[in-house]
């Protein structure tokens, strides 16, 4: 994987700007990211382009708001494919999305400790 999942400088900046409310955002992301990943994988398996599009779009947006630009970029790549009406997502992209999600969840979990 060539790009890191989380931009440390952007993450720190968002943390400073949001103060204590940032922990709430982190908690929401910790709940939503694994669920969104599972929904994306299920939508690909079930050939459900509508779910694939909407969930990848949500993931992209929420990741961008916390500085997880690498993960957002991978979600956007899936969003763009699904926007064209396809669920034919390259396996490497799904693997990269899964790995990036794991990285972001690890970083966010450590932040709450």
Please state what every model-predicted region is.
Residues 1-54, 58-113:
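Two-component system phosphorelay core
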């Amino acid at each position: 994987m060539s790009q890191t999942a989380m931009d440390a400088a952007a993450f720190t900046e968002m943390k400073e700007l949001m103060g204590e409310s940032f922990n709430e955002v982190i908690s929401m992301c910790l709940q939503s990211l694994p669920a969104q990943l599972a929904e994306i994988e299920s939508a690909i398996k079930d050939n459900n382009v509508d779910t694939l599009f909407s969930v990848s779009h949500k993931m992209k947006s929420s990741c961008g708001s916390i500085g997880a630009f690498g993960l957002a970029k991978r979600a956007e790549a899936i969003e763009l494919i699904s926007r064209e009406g396809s669920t034919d997502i390259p396996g490497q992209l799904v693997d990269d999305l899964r790995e990036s999600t794991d990285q972001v969840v690890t970083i966010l979990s450590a932040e709450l400790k």
